[in-house]
């Protein structure tokens, strides 16, 4: 051991020497053949811990700070600690803390301000005593200020006690002192790496390099750009991105070490202790310029001086106050910039020089400073081992974190045979949000040091792998302990306000734990976890949303699937029956799960869909609840102003309606909602008509009205007749049930006539003879023609017809691209829509965007124009102002493609689409429609082609003499299944009025086949109103085939049989 500095009280441990000041490093004979584990320096005393855990002290003992009876100039063992294996010490001005290998803390010395934490009345304690209030807490670090003390626990909890004159306890109170350790609640949840204390200021350092400081700040020693004392922890923002790994404090100054080996200092600089070649104070962290270029691995602060070790040269540098020789430069001069401590320093792994006396060279192991003294633990070049590196924290001094080594240790014990300490270790880790927040860090490239509002610093793949490694069926005791800790200790303590972004990480990682997706834990872990998440204040929730937004899709989907499973689990319980006494808590649980999904859905939509929108669909909803009733309840809640944006406590009193969270509905459920909404509106229209008709009986002035919207049309003039009626129709009448009458036909419209009406009128309206739509050969799709001569009324009519079809639950045959449905739902068409409508043009646009070279102008020769046909002639249209003079290049090509798409789908047809849109929404507007995705709305309007012919057979019903095994029925299905696809589609058209199936699927298409009294010479007859087929009792398969094909080839017109 080398020692230098103030020796006036024997604090260097050199024995009875004549000098009161040692100006340069001097070997201490006492430590020959002794290995030093730690050194603590007070103002006038020093404490040494040897590798065997014994403690020695020397220096002034006026206040009992040595832990034995008298002052000593040579180190003397503290006998009271003989039975303890001490691993670390720290000294205040005149008090000492010692930490043993069990995490227990012993204190002695001056207790004027409660700095010993013993809650006693004695001014001085001369024999070490255990701090009993910390005896049940495993402490890993201690730090002493002059008159206050700090401790860090394995569970990442910080405790403070002693003087609080300047707020150095960080408790936010103006009490002058605390005589017992106080938990620093304001920092709960943060994963800490270190605690440090100066004269009257304090710091904590997180695992990802964030520094929080509080206490005295007269000289800017907190680095907060001012000189105001702080009574609560404050984040030192300027160093957040610097990868700080270690921090130490002097009386009124602070030094911080970076991962790259740089040093920042701030605070009092009157003696040059900041190393900036000046005596100015610094209120902001400033890098020590003269150490740049060297990699520093150790730093230490004395009262008013600073030391730094550079392993590449083996040298120690010091700066600051030198009046007591504490700089080791051979003089008492102050140094304002780093100066080499005198000595024959030898770097680790250096090349031995020939003919040297190895005893005269020193390989530094570790440096210590405090008060006005300094120490260096060294070895000879011959026995030189690697020096300590403060950039690599000692694992024994760190908080619990879930990692590979810890899991392997836990799994190494046979199931059911855990030692108590292992159970305590598991419990401590999973009871602490701070420990979980320090787990699974993204250590590759030191990524976790970038933790902020946009980046979590978490390796999610590591979290998943380690959780799955830990939670295994053959180690149930571990799973049970983890679950109990989460349920009873961690989640109940969560708060809505968090001190820092690092305290949020476990909200990201915990869903990866298999216990969360175990239905046995839904109500005890997953839902309480979701409650804490939903209750987060706006700022932390926003950060969590930011982190979610950059997750890989499978990881994001994992969280969504978890809470979907929770919802399904709860709805199954609801279907079985919830006792009245438990309904309130059930409401709260269900609202929680749905609220979490709502937040995730908001993030998904904001990011342009991390996962497909349909991944939020809960397909079981229709089976588990009555959607129609749910919708009615929701409408009533809206009418009575029940706000579902309350907190979860208030929501518990409001019955849950799934319609409040419509993103969970799949297309079939949405269709049911729309149909329910239409039925409600129809009923309201009918009721209003009945009321008016009743009134007309007593008040002749009031004209009676029809409860239905009646369309009387001729087949030969279907468009003209329909337009005539619809032009005169009031908006309110569109909400009535539609009945269609074909002139000269006897059928009563129970649905089938209406189906054919839509089929025929749309065929007419979309006929090229009107010139209203352009037909695209490549895609076989149509789009509005900007060259039409037709009045916009006709487009308005088509919109009304489409709206009426949806409103009246009828499929219509429209060959529009998906872009139409996007526009109806207020979504923008994209290049993909252009590819669908105009495949060749779309491919060309994609090639333009993908072209890798810079010579786009020469290769493509494009400008911001589009060439269109106009009755045989071509016409050039500018896509932007001065488009003809604007060449398309690499920088603006995306803008050109966007403008092209916008022209085709928007600008060129704006007035025509507006008329269509107005007509459509006149009938079918409303909140429910906007729940649909474009492709879902398309499927609802035109049906889909997801044919399942076996399902059709399975769902068919029989009347009269027929049943499933009747001979005629058996040959009917044989014939049907042998028909080609086109004939099967024709059969659907013949029987139902459409060759497409409803969005609800084949199972919703109920066919009925009944026997007739006629002979085999008769054809099958369809009643499209009822999806009913009259099938004669054919006995021969070929006869049935011939008659069926003949019937479906002639399927237009209605007559009574």
Swiss-Prot record:
<protein>
    <recommendedName>
        <fullName>Probable E3 ubiquitin-protein ligase HERC4</fullName>
        <ecNumber>2.3.2.26</ecNumber>
    </recommendedName>
</protein>
<dbReference type="Pfam" id="PF25390">
    <property type="entry name" value="WD40_RLD"/>
</dbReference>
<feature type="repeat" description="RCC1 4">
    <location>
        <begin position="156"/>
        <end position="207"/>
    </location>
</feature>
<keyword id="KW-0744">Spermatogenesis</keyword>
<feature type="repeat" description="RCC1 1">
    <location>
        <begin position="1"/>
        <end position="51"/>
    </location>
</feature>
<keyword id="KW-0221">Differentiation</keyword>
<dbReference type="Pfam" id="PF00632">
    <property type="entry name" value="HECT"/>
</dbReference>
<feature type="repeat" description="RCC1 6">
    <location>
        <begin position="261"/>
        <end position="311"/>
    </location>
</feature>
<keyword id="KW-0833">Ubl conjugation pathway</keyword>
<dbReference type="InterPro" id="IPR051709">
    <property type="entry name" value="Ub-ligase/GTPase-reg"/>
</dbReference>
<feature type="repeat" description="RCC1 7">
    <location>
        <begin position="313"/>
        <end position="368"/>
    </location>
</feature>
<feature type="repeat" description="RCC1 3">
    <location>
        <begin position="102"/>
        <end position="154"/>
    </location>
</feature>
<dbReference type="InterPro" id="IPR035983">
    <property type="entry name" value="Hect_E3_ubiquitin_ligase"/>
</dbReference>
<dbReference type="GO" id="GO:0005737">
    <property type="term" value="C:cytoplasm"/>
</dbReference>
<dbReference type="GO" id="GO:0001650">
    <property type="term" value="C:fibrillar center"/>
</dbReference>
<keyword id="KW-0808">Transferase</keyword>
<dbReference type="GO" id="GO:0007283">
    <property type="term" value="P:spermatogenesis"/>
</dbReference>
<dbReference type="InterPro" id="IPR009091">
    <property type="entry name" value="RCC1/BLIP-II"/>
</dbReference>
<feature type="active site" description="Glycyl thioester intermediate">
    <location>
        <position position="1025"/>
    </location>
</feature>
<comment type="function">
    <text>Probable E3 ubiquitin-protein ligase involved in either protein trafficking or in the distribution of cellular structures. Required for spermatozoon maturation and fertility, and for the removal of the cytoplasmic droplet of the spermatozoon. E3 ubiquitin-protein ligases accept ubiquitin from an E2 ubiquitin-conjugating enzyme in the form of a thioester and then directly transfer it to targeted substrates.</text>
</comment>
<keyword id="KW-0677">Repeat</keyword>
<comment type="pathway">
    <text>Protein modification; protein ubiquitination.</text>
</comment>
<dbReference type="InterPro" id="IPR000569">
    <property type="entry name" value="HECT_dom"/>
</dbReference>
<keyword id="KW-0963">Cytoplasm</keyword>
<feature type="repeat" description="RCC1 2">
    <location>
        <begin position="52"/>
        <end position="101"/>
    </location>
</feature>
<dbReference type="GO" id="GO:0030154">
    <property type="term" value="P:cell differentiation"/>
</dbReference>
<feature type="domain" description="HECT">
    <location>
        <begin position="730"/>
        <end position="1057"/>
    </location>
</feature>
<dbReference type="GO" id="GO:0006511">
    <property type="term" value="P:ubiquitin-dependent protein catabolic process"/>
</dbReference>
<dbReference type="GO" id="GO:0045879">
    <property type="term" value="P:negative regulation of smoothened signaling pathway"/>
</dbReference>
<dbReference type="InterPro" id="IPR000408">
    <property type="entry name" value="Reg_chr_condens"/>
</dbReference>
<dbReference type="GO" id="GO:0016567">
    <property type="term" value="P:protein ubiquitination"/>
</dbReference>
<dbReference type="GO" id="GO:0005829">
    <property type="term" value="C:cytosol"/>
</dbReference>
<dbReference type="GO" id="GO:0061630">
    <property type="term" value="F:ubiquitin protein ligase activity"/>
</dbReference>
<feature type="repeat" description="RCC1 5">
    <location>
        <begin position="208"/>
        <end position="259"/>
    </location>
</feature>
């Amino acid at each position: 051991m080398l020692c230098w500095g103030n020796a006036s009280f024997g604090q260097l441990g050199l024995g009875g020497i004549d000098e009161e000041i040692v100006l340069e490093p001097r070997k201490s004979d006492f430590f020959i053949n002794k290995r030093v584990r730690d050194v603590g320096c007070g103002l006038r005393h020093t404490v040494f811990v040897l590798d065997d855990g014994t403690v020695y002290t020397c220096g002034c003992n006026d206040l009992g700070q040595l832990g034995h009876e008298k002052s000593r100039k040579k180190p003397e063992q503290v006998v009271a600690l003989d039975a303890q294996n001490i691993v670390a010490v720290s000294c205040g001005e005149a008090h000492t803390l010692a930490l043993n290998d069990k995490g227990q803390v012993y204190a002695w010395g001056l207790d004027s301000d409660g700095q010993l934490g013993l809650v006693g009345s004695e001014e001085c304690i001369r024999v070490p005593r255990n701090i009993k209030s910390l005896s049940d807490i495993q402490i890993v670090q201690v730090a002493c200020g002059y008159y206050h003390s700090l401790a860090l626990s394995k569970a990442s909890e910080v405790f403070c006690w002693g003087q609080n004159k300047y707020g150095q306890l960080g408790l936010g109170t103006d009490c002058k002192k605390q005589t017992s350790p106080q938990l620093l609640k304001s920092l709960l949840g943060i994963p800490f790496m270190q605690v440090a204390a100066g004269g009257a200021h304090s710091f904590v350092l997180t695992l990802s390099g964030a520094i929080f400081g509080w206490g005295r700040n007269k000289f800017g020693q907190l680095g907060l750009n001012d000189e105001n004392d702080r009574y609560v922890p404050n984040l030192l923002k300027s160093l957040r991105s610097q990868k700080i790994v270690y921090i130490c404090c002097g009386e009124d100054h602070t030094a911080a070490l970076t991962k790259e080996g740089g040093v920042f200092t701030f605070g009092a600089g009157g003696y040059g202790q900041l190393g900036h070649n000046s005596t100015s104070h610094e209120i902001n962290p400033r890098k020590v310029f003269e150490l740049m270029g060297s990699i520093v691995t150790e730093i230490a602060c004395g009262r008013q001086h600073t030391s730094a070790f550079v392993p590449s040269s083996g040298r120690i540098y010091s700066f600051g106050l030198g009046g007591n020789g504490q700089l080791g430069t051979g003089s008492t001069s102050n140094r304002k910039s780093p100066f080499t401590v005198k000595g024959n320093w030898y770097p680790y792994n250096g090349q031995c020089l020939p003919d040297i006396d190895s005893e005269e060279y020193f390989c530094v192991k570790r440096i210590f400073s405090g008060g006005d003294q300094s120490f260096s633990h060294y070895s000879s070049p011959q026995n030189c081992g690697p020096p300590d590196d403060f950039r690599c924290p000692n694992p024994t001094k760190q908080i619990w974190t879930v990692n590979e080594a810890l899991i392997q240790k836990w799994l190494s014990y046979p199931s059911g045979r855990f030692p108590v300490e292992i159970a305590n270790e598991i419990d401590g880790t999973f009871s602490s949000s701070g420990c979980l927040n320090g787990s699974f860090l993204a250590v590759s490239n030191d990524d976790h040091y970038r933790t902020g509002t946009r980046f979590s610093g978490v390796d999610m793949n590591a979290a998943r792998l380690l959780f799955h490694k830990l939670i295994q069926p053959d180690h149930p005791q571990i799973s049970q302990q983890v679950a109990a800790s989460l349920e009873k200790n961690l989640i109940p303590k969560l708060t809505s306000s968090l001190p820092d972004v690092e305290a949020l990480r476990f909200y990201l990682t915990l869903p990866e734990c298999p216990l969360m997706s175990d239905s046995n834990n839904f109500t005890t872990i997953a839902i309480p976890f979701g409650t804490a998440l939903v209750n987060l204040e706006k700022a932390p929730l926003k950060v969590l949303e930011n982190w979610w937004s950059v997750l890989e899709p499978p990881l994001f989907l994992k969280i969504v699937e978890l809470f979907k499973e929770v919802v399904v689990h709860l709805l199954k319980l609801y279907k079985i029956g919830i006792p009245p006494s438990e309904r309130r808590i059930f409401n709260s649980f269900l609202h929680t799960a749905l609220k979490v999904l709502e937040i995730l859905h908001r993030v998904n939509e904001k990011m342009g869909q991390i996962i497909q929108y349909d991944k939020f669909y809960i397909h079981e909803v229709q089976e588990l609840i009555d959607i129609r009733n749910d919708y009615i309840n929701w409408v009533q809640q809206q009418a009575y102003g029940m706000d579902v944006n309350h907190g979860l406590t208030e929501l518990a009193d409001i019955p849950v309606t799934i319609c409040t969270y419509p993103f969970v509905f799949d297309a079939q459920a949405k269709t049911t909602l729309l149909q329910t909404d239409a039925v409600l509106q129809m009923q309201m229209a009918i009721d209003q008509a009945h009321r008016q008709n009743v009134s007309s009986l007593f008040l002749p002035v009031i004209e009676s009205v029809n409860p239905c919207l009646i369309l009387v049309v001729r087949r030969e003039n279907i468009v003209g007749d329909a337009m005539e009626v619809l032009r005169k129709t009031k908006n309110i009448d569109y909400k009535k049930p539609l009945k269609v009458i074909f002139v000269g036909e006897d059928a009563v419209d129970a649905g089938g006539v209406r189906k054919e009406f839509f089929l025929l009128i749309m065929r007419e309206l979309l006929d090229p003879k009107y010139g209203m739509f352009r037909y695209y050969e490549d895609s076989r799709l149509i789009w509005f023609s900007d060259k039409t001569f037709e009045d916009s009324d006709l487009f308005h009519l088509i919109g009304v017809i489409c709206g009426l079809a949806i409103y009246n639950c009828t499929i219509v045959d429209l060959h529009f691209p998906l872009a139409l449905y996007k526009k109806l739902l207020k979504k923008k068409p994209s290049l993909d829509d252009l590819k669908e409508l105009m495949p060749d043009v779309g491919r060309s646009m994609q090639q333009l965007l993908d072209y890798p070279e810079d010579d786009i102008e020469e290769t493509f020769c494009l400008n911001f124009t589009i060439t269109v046909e106009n009755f045989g002639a071509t016409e050039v249209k500018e896509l932007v102002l001065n488009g003809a003079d604007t060449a398309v290049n690499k920088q603006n090509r995306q803008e050109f493609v966007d403008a092209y798409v916008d022209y085709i789908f928007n600008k060129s047809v704006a007035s025509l689409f507006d008329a269509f849109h107005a007509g459509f929404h006149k009938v079918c507007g409303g909140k429910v429609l906007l729940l649909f995705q474009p492709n879902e709305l398309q499927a609802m309007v035109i049906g889909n082609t997801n044919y399942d012919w076996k399902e059709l057979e399975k769902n068919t019903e029989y009347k009269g003499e027929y049943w499933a095994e009747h001979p005629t029925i058996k040959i009917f299905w044989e014939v049907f299944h042998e028909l080609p696809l086109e004939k099967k589609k024709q059969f659907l058209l013949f029987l139902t009025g459409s060759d497409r199936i409803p969005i609800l699927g084949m199972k919703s298409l109920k066919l009925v086949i009944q026997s007739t009294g006629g002979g085999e010479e008769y054809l099958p007859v369809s009643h499209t109103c009822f999806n009913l087929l009259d099938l004669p009792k054919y006995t021969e398969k070929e006869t049935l085939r011939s008659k069926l094909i003949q019937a479906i080839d002639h399927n237009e017109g209605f007559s009574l049989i």
